């Protein structure tokens, strides 16, 4: 999953903070590094903190309660957290009463004793996703929560799209991944609990829900009756007011015919599937302990595209894993050329302590030099940029439906059913609404267009585009 730094503070909170008289002792600051699961955990914590009377602080020095939600997927993520902790250490010299919590995947089994000696500025260490445990550490609460906090609970303007965790942990044993060591074994949330939470979120104004799990398509196998993700999609799909439904991240081993059929049949379930492949060589997939072959993956992609012709497919790839020869890397390159994904998250291998791949990295006959890792990463990124540009070009002059998430640099920003990012201009407020947009420009990362307010507008703009194309000797 992509490593991102997130500062969790709603825009309206920033705008009104200077007018807010909340004292420092009831202000919090949450800083998050990592995947969307971490982001969701932090959003829930913020909603809970606001529910007991806290207000967000824009800067750590303005808060008495600081929470750093950490990631261990790559070394760079841990380095960011350690850098932030150095900043916090200086702050605590000035404000020794500040309470600091290190939360998330850095705080796994066996790690707390190590970090307690290395990180004296941290008052408490809390395992991933334990929102209630972090909340209990907050000093000076005014209220008590009457029900579990939602990620939109205290926001005047809830986000258009909300991520809902449906499962925690992971039972896989991929050679490179530290997540099972940090988040533990899979635990699925009950179907009724998830549906009720989604219902409450939509009632607060959210329009799109993304169901979230480390291996989201394995949801339910540990629950009574063994429901599956297809069952859950059908249950959430029928919530009144919900416009769109997505899920991530999937594993090829759990992508069943029932799940593919559900995505194909449910109109509000978006044709958007993330299916990490990690490598395009059978020997390397075996080393990685992925549990499938290249041909099985290719067959699965063909099955998905046959059932969902307009599907948008994204994947994850690791380059430089121990044992990746140049020949094996070329297999991954061929796979990307053949399948032509809409988007690929490409990462250079990062050795994580405790994983099988970390031991392999110590073998000089298996390790890939760091410089070579980066060269391979750049090579695939350039290839994928070209593929993405070509795939997005098919939207030129087409009218697409865009769920508008908000404003960005003077333009409205939203996404198509296939999760393509679209920008357009209009004086009206389109936040949370579905817009018909005629695409006038495409690129590898986003699309731009004009609003088609009516059939007359569509005909006028489309006619102009045809005229331009004809003048250039091209077909629309």
Swiss-Prot record:
Its main location: cytoplasm. CDD domains: Radical_SAM. This is tRNA-2-methylthio-N(6)-dimethylallyladenosine synthase. Residues 26-147 form the MTTase N-terminal domain. One of its GO terms (molecular function) is N6-isopentenyladenosine methylthiotransferase activity. It comes from Roseiflexus sp. (strain RS-1). Monomer. Residues 1-14 have a biased composition (Basic and acidic residues). Catalyzes the methylthiolation of N6-(dimethylallyl)adenosine (i(6)A), leading to the formation of 2-methylthio-N6-(dimethylallyl)adenosine (ms(2)i(6)A) at position 37 in tRNAs that read codons beginning with uridine. Binds 2 [4Fe-4S] clusters. One cluster is coordinated with 3 cysteines and an exchangeable S-adenosyl-L-methionine. Residues 393-453 form the TRAM domain. Its cofactor is [4Fe-4S] cluster.
């Amino acid at each position: 999953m992509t490593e991102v730094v997130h500062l969790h503070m709603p825009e309206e909170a920033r705008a009104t903070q200077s007018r807010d008289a909340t004292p420092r002792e009831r202000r919090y600051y949450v800083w998050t590094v990592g995947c969307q699961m971490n982001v969701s955990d932090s959003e829930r914590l913020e909603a809970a903190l606001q529910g007991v009377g806290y207000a967000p602080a824009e800067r750590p020095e303005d808060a008495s309660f600081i929470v750093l939600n950490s990631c261990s997927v790559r070394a760079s993520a841990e380095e960011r957290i350690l850098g932030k902790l150095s900043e916090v250490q200086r702050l605590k010299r000035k404000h020794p009463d500040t309470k600091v919590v290190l939360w998330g995947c850095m705080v796994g089994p066996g790690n707390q004793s190590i970090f307690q000696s290395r990180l004296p500025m941290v008052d408490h260490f809390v395992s991933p996703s334990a929102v209630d445990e972090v909340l209990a550490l907050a000093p000076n609460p005014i209220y008590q929560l009457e029900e579990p906090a939602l990620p939109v609970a205290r926001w005047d303007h809830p986000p258009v799209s909300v991520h809902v965790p449906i499962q925690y942990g992971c039972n896989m044993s991929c050679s490179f991944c530290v997540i099972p060591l940090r988040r533990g074994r899979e635990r699925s949330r009950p179907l009724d609990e998830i549906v009720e939470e989604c219902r409450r979120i939509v009632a607060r104004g959210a329009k799109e829900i993304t169901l979230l799990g480390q291996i989201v398509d394995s949801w339910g196998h540990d629950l009574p009756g063994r429901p599956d993700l297809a069952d859950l999609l059908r249950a959430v799909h029928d919530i009144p007011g919900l416009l769109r439904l997505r899920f991530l991240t999937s594993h090829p081993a759990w992508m069943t015919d029932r799940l593919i059929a559900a995505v194909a049949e449910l109109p509000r379930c978006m044709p958007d599937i993330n299916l990490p492949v990690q490598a395009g060589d059978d020997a390397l997939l075996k080393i990685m302990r992925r549990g499938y072959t290249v041909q099985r993956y290719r067959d699965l992609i063909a099955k998905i595209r046959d059932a969902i012709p307009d599907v948008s497919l994204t994947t994850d790839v690791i380059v430089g894993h121990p044992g990746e020869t140049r020949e094996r890397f070329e297999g991954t390159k061929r796979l990307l050329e053949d399948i032509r994904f809409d988007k690929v998250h490409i990462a250079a291998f990062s050795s994580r302590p405790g994983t099988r791949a970390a031991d392999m990295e110590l073998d000089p006959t298996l390790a890939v030099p760091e410089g070579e890792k980066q060269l391979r990463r750049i090579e695939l990124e350039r290839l994928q940029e070209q593929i993405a540009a070509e795939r997005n070009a098919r939207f030129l002059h087409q009218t697409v439906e865009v769920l508008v998430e908000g404003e960005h640099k003077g333009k409205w920003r939203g996404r198509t059913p296939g999760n393509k990012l679209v920008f357009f201009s209009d004086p009206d407020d389109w936040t949370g609404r579905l817009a018909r947009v005629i695409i006038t420009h495409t690129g590898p990362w986003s699309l731009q267009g004009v609003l088609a307010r009516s059939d007359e507008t569509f005909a006028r703009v489309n006619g102009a585009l045809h005229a331009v194309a004809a003048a250039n000797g091209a077909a629309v």
